[in-house]
Amino acid sequence: MSLVAYASSDESEPDEAEPEPEEEEAVAPTSGPALGGLFASLPAPKGPALLPPPPQMLAPAFPPPLLLPPPTGDPRLQPPPPLPFGLGGFPPPPGVSPAEAAGVGEGLGLGLPSPRGPGLNLPPPIGGAGPPLGLPKPKKRKEPVKIAAPELHKGDSDSEEDEPTKKKTILQGSSEGTGLSALLPQPKNLTVKETNRLLLPHAFSRKPSDGSPDTKPSRLASKTKTSSLAPVVGTTTTTPSPSAIKAAAKSAALQVTKQITQEEDDSDEEVAPENFFSLPEKAEPPGVEPYPYPIPTVPEELPPGTEPEPAFQDDAANAPLEFKMAAGSSGAPWMPKPGDDYSYNQFSTYGDANAAGAYYQDYYSGGYYPAQDPALVPPQEIAPDASFIDDEAFKRLQGKRNRGREEINFVEIKGDDQLSGAQQWMTKSLTEEKTMKSFSKKKGEQPTGQQRRKHQITYLIHQAKERELELKNTWSENKLSRRQTQAKYGF
């Protein structure tokens, strides 16, 4: 007998618990078969110790005439005597009757009262602390008893999909659960799901007219969007699965990055590209209009090929060259006459003129203007001026000042004077003994380590040869340097 039998009898099982007392009452009168067959035919005694509970308390549906004594004919049909509870399930000793054994159990106080569990309506025992021989026979069960808690039956729907979520919410969200989660307080920053929020990405819900002019409000809206996206992850009362949480977090992160990149693109389109030094990339000439493409007017004394280039070479280089070569213009004295032959002396006479001489000194004392690229310059259209331009280029090749006056001085340089020690170099290269050191010691050229340690004669000879070669080289180098100083300074 165990205590589990009290918890196993519930209100929902009246049909199983009622017929058991009948069997027990049928067995109870046979507690003393060892006293003889006369006591077996007598009814049950009326004492409080062995009196079973009345049938009105345990089984009111069955009348008492149904309690029949066992047959007395064949002793084999009689059931074995029940073991009293006071002796722990062991048979009484041979000199003790079952009544005395029951009295011993009563004196020890081993009779247990009925447990007061939830949902059990058992009457208290009649005999006080008497032996529980009149109690119903315990029913043995293989499975443990499962008592359903009332908190689990709150939901109205019986669908299988809602059941795991309800169990999770009882353990996590509500304070009625058991375990560590019941001891924890409610979270302070509890987010609530928005009901009217559209579950669309920002790229689809955004209008195409929105964009560059209001970048700051869009950034504020993005912050609110990201805050509103947070409840999707895990704010509802039903906790989703971790895979759904990960998927929602990934989608939210992708939406935020897309929104940030779109805002950056809009801001890049709005703001013009600026230089790091706050300077425009292309230096546009501020006063292009007052400078027409015909080359600006220059003093009339200048020759046609020597006008200074304009300040803005980009515009002037692409423009067609216009030379002031008109016959009636002031540049007429620079025009060559078709019947004259200009020699070098005639060009040198221009340098003697007062106005032209002043021009040359002023022109060449200033900065030098490089000639334009011949690929950009169009071919000359005026044929008789080609020889004049070639002569002018030839005049530039002579010198900057006093053209035609300087004399060419030829300086003779002899190679023998520069290469005074060539003979010594040749003799040195021919007679120098080079040290051909091989890395292999087996060929006999290099001494071995054992020869160096023991100072053998072969190592000493090799060392003398090396020093003799070094001595010869130093002597020849000193002699060469002495010859070079004599050839250079004369002493």
Swiss-Prot record:
Keywords: Cell cycle, Chromosomal rearrangement, Nucleus, Phosphoprotein, Proto-oncogene. It comes from Homo sapiens. It holds the Pfam family PRCC. It is found in: Nucleus. This is Proline-rich protein PRCC. May regulate cell cycle progression through interaction with MAD2L2. Residues 50-96, 287-307 have a biased composition (Pro residues). Residues 10-26, 262-272 have a biased composition (Acidic residues). The gene is PRCC. Transmembrane segments: none annotated. Residues 40-49, 111-120, 230-244 have a biased composition (Low complexity). The modification Phosphoserine is found at residues 97, 114, 157, 159, 212, 218, 241, 267. Residues 1-244, 260-313, 432-454 are annotated as: Disordered. Ubiquitous in fetal and adult tissues. The keyword Nucleus applies. Interacts with MAD2L2; the interaction is direct. It comes from the Eukaryota.
